[in-house]
């Protein structure tokens, strides 16, 4: 893996030099855009809207529109805005890991100590495991400030970017009916169904089936075969009574 950021994790007066590596990888198929008439590749060009000529990449700069003009922002300006956050993941507090709502999660990154046999790294990793806590921190990655949690995963300290509170939309925008009454009998049956389906989390057994099926179709078409299209068979509910549906679901699970 290639590191995408080099800096340090700071907590208290302790500074741990680390490298950051992306912990996730895309499984999407790499599809090219083609002209349907001759299957030639589609190319996008960076065109100057005044001269209508293509602009070399090294001549492109970033600008912010301010009072009908543009202020040009250079790499040094991004770093000057928060020099310490560009190089340090400063832990501001420790929180219960389970208290972080999954809605806030974004991307995760592995950290690796920049030096071998780094005792401070080993200490923080072990302390996070023992305490069940996660460090809450802020840092700048790719010119964007991110809130993040610093938490242990097996033998690595992981930095997971999380959203700021203002990025989460308020549920008041939804048309939700809070006046629906659920009977105790229905609730008990719902809880029984949840317990029936409850099992230890094993994400490794879940595969990207859509990706696999799409790849099968591509391989069939490459061989000149017509792919077999599976028709969706909608599940029919047995009646409109919620209790009966829950009871039937329990029976189906037991007989599986």
For the regions a protein language model found, what residue spans apply to each?
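Boundary segments of small protein-protein interaction reader/adaptor domains
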Residues: 1-256
